[in-house]
Amino acid sequence: MASARPPSPEELLAASEKAFEAGRFEEALHRADEAIRRDGRSLAAHHYRAAALAELGRLEEAREAYEAALALDRDDLDLLVGAADFHVNLLQEDEAERDLVERGIALARRGAKLARKADDPALEGEFRRLEAAGLNQLGLSREALRVLQDAEAALPDSVEVMLEKGFALYELCRFGEARAALLRAEALDRDEPWTQHYLGLVAERAGDEEEARRRFGRARKLDPDAFPKPIALSPEAFDAAVEDALASLPDAVRRYLSNVAITVEDHPSDDDLLAPDPPLSPAILGLFRGAPYGQKASMDPWSHFPSAIVLYQRNLERFARTRAELIEQIGITLIHEVGHFLGLDEDELWARGLE
C-alpha cells in the first residue's frame, strides 16, 4: 500500500493561514514550521511563524522571527506592516523599549516610502499611522501629529488614526482638540475601549467626574483585562501606602529622599504640565520640583525653594489593582524622581533603567 503523499509547502502554508485566521495559533505555528523545513526561504512561512509567535505571547521569539523574515525580503509590504505593528504596538504592551520602538518606526517609514512608490495611498496611510504610534510611544507627540496629518488624509474614516490623534493631543495637553478627535473616533466605532478610556481621561481633566466614571466603566466593560477597576484609597490610606513604599526602598535612595519633601495631589496641575516645552504628559505619576542636588546656587529664583517630589494619586491608582501593586509603583516613581533630583535627564534615566 502506497504511503500518503506529504503535504506540499503550498498546502502547509494554506493550512497555517486557515489555522491563524481561526485563532488556532499553535497549529498555525506548527504548520509554518513544517513549511520552513520544506522550504527555508519561504517568506510567507516565516511571516506566519512570526505572527503566530506574537499571538502566543512568545515575543522575543516573534521578534527574532520577524528579523529572519525581513532578512529574506526587506521590501515586502505585508511583512513590513506586520513587523512595524509588532514593534510599536504588541511588543510595547508592558513597557516601551526605546531601541525596539525606533526599529518599528524605521520599518513603518520604509513601508510608507515603498507604498508611495506602489501608488497605494491607503497602505501608505497605515504605515504613517504606525509611525505615529511609535512616536507617541517615545513621547514625541508633536512629531506624531505631523505624521498623522498624512495618515488622516489617506484614511479619513480610520478609527485607529483618530484614536492615535486623540492620544497625541491629550499628551500635548490640548484637551479640547483631543476630545473632538476622540468623539470622531467614537462616531466611527462606539465599541473601541481605548476611545472610551481616553474620553474618560479628558472628562476627568475637565472636572466632569460623572462622565469620567461612565467612560471608564464602559471601557472596563468592553475590555476588562486592559482596564481593570483601579484601587481607590482615602488620602490617609494613600499616605500610609507612601510610607510603606519609602520603607521598601534601598538605603541610598532613602538617604537622598531625606532632603526632599514628598507631597500628594490628585492630578497634575495645568501649570506643572505646561511649564516645560513640550508639555509633560497628563498621565505622569510624579514630578520633581526644585533644583537638582548640588545646584542650589543657581541664578534661577525657583531653585531657592526646597526640593519636592509630588505624587499624583489618581494616576498612580490607575496603575494598580491591589495595594501591593500600588506600593510597588509608588516606589518606582520615587526612584525615577530621585533621578531627576540627582540631575539626570529623561535619556539618562532611560539608560539607567529609571524611566
What are these regions (language model features)?
Residues 38, 72, 114, 118, ...:
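Structural marker of alpha-solenoid helical repeat scaffolds
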